[in-house]
A protein has these predicted regions:
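Two-component system phosphorelay core
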Residues: 1-88, 92-94, 98-143
């Protein structure tokens, strides 16, 4: 499903034509929006979000966030009952998600944070599984 501004951009005909690369980038951005990742709510909101360079940088930043070491560190700190380090990791992940306009993780992050505060390893791991499943889906659609 494409959002209206992307449909408008994709349907431009005549003297202005989009490159194949721009079409692929627009499709990736539209897929990201389906997962609650919106470039217009990110640190790029003041830039021309239909610019090929801006879209490329944004997609690269989202991809890097999805595979960043902080997710692995969070899992390790929870498994080792290092609650203070886990709390720091979840705060850093949430801050980075907010910068990139990734809203789909906030509910899960709140669940992980609550489990960390209660020192409930089982609940924290269950919430982390939800986050990891979402990450896998997002990365699959990003190509």
């Amino acid at each position: 499903m494409y959002y209206p501004e992307y449909i408008r951009k994709l349907s431009v005909r005549g003297s202005v034509s989009m490159s194949a690369r721009e079409q692929v980038l627009m499709k990736i951005i539209a897929n990201l929006r389906r997962f609650g990742i919106d470039i217009s709510n990110s640190k790029f909101k003041d830039k021309d979000i239909e610019n090929e360079v801006v879209m490329t940088v944004y997609i690269k930043d989202v991809r890097e966030y999805m595979v960043c070491y902080d997710f692995i560190r969070l899992e390790q700190t929870i498994n080792n009952s290092q609650w203070s380090a886990a709390y720091t990791s979840i705060n850093r992940l949430e801050e980075n998600a907010r910068e990139l306009g990734i809203n789909s993780f906030f509910k899960s992050f709140d669940g992980i944070r609550g489990a960390i505060i209660q020192k409930n390893m089982r609940s924290a791991k269950q919430s982390l599984v939800v986050v990891n499943n979402k990450k896998t889906q997002i990365l699959k659609y990003m190509g």
